[in-house]
Amino acid sequence: MLYEGYLKYMKAKYGERSQGTYFMAGEDLISKLPDSLITQILLYLPIKDIVRTSSLSSRWKSLWLLIPRLDLDSEEFQDYNAFVGFMNKFIDFSGEEKICLDKLKLSSRKTVNDLPCVTRWIDFVVRRKLKHLDVECLVNRKFLEEMPLSLYVCDTLVNLRLHRVLLGKFEAVSLPCLKTMRLEENVYANDVVLESLISSCPVLKDLIILRMFEDNVKVLRVHSLTLTSLNIDFNFGEGDDFVDGFDKKVSGVLIDAPRLKYLKFQDDLSGSKIITNSGSLAKVNVVYVFNENDCADVVDIPRRNMVRNFLTSISGVSDMKISQHFVEFLYYYKDFDPLPQFCNLSRLKAEISLYFLEILPTILESCPNLKSLVMVLEFYLQEEDEPIIFSSVPRCLVSSLESVEIKKFNGRPAKMEVARYFLENSGVLQKLVLHLRCSTHEDGFYILKDLLALPRGSSTCRIVVC
């Protein structure tokens, strides 16, 4: 057991040539190693084997408590009671000895009849200067366990992930070292709890919020002076009992993070979306934000202004990815308001279906300095023979676009017309990259032959097929 752990340690540290020289002539030389090295070796063993080492001798009795990382999954135990028993023994034993736990990952899957115990465990470890905490409770939202008050004032936490837990009210919150926080499908006492949790992290850099329906948060407010990366995802959860009558009009998202550089936004459930102080924003990934109903009501001027302001707030980025759903929204939006100018945008990745492909020149016209374009063409088979006519040639095709990459390209008429459009009208294009999808090598040969026969606006353009 120890020898296997030793070999894994040596292989990880020194590579394949390392030799197991600490077991020679039946002599146990590992026990003579310093505690710090033994604990590193123990990390390469399953948790059950790590605990078993405590029975080897008095030298080993409490060594396993010195391991800096602990990864526990209730599924790896005989049943949930065995899992609970192990954790209780760990806490009892740790109360008598000084533990050096730096990182804890805890995954709990329990049924209705299983007793709650995660709260007590988390309270125990965060009081002992834990730095990295990952808690995953895979239960129905009716049986979520509440996080202890001690978690909100842990002055050593650097990374925190909470999945399907309850965050209740607290009198104080202070997480002075927390840099990364991932909150997934949790339930909160109210809006203030989540807002205060975020704003009370003075060095927070990365924040991910995956919300579920009925999480008790009407308006998500993200206020942070240090945040550089933000991912917001609000969808209907799986396996939950949903409550009818969700009021979109009173729900919203407010982001005020002046140092924010990266934003991924996937939320079409909230009614209002507002971003302020977005001057540092450089990269966005827009999945779900709006739909055609958000701009079709010409009477609802405040709502149309909200949509316009959101688009303007992300218009200064240099790198943008937009989903098929967002392209569909822009298709309808163009009939009511012009798109803002994305003058700094140099890289764009877009998922586009044939039905909304005519919006492509309009999108490109709003990106006058675009250099790189990646397109994922999501066409249905029956659409691929439909004729396509592009109405205009945007400025970026003439003066700045250097690289075009088309994924899911099969040479059918509709997709061939897209390739022709860029080859013929791009004045400074350096390369056209096509990710070819065809059933035979012969089909690929004829597709490439047709591509090479197309006229080119740039004499230096290369066609790359992969």
From Swiss-Prot:
SMART domains: FBD (SM00579), FBOX (SM00256). Residues 27-80 form the F-box domain. It comes from Arabidopsis thaliana. Pfam families: F-box, FBD, LRR_At5g56370. It comes from the Eukaryota. This is FBD-associated F-box protein At5g22730. InterPro entries: F-box-like_dom_sf, F-box_AtFBL13-like, F-box_dom, FBD, FBL13/AtMIF1-like, LRR_dom_sf, LRR_FXL15/At3g58940/PEG3-like. Residues 385-436 form the FBD domain.
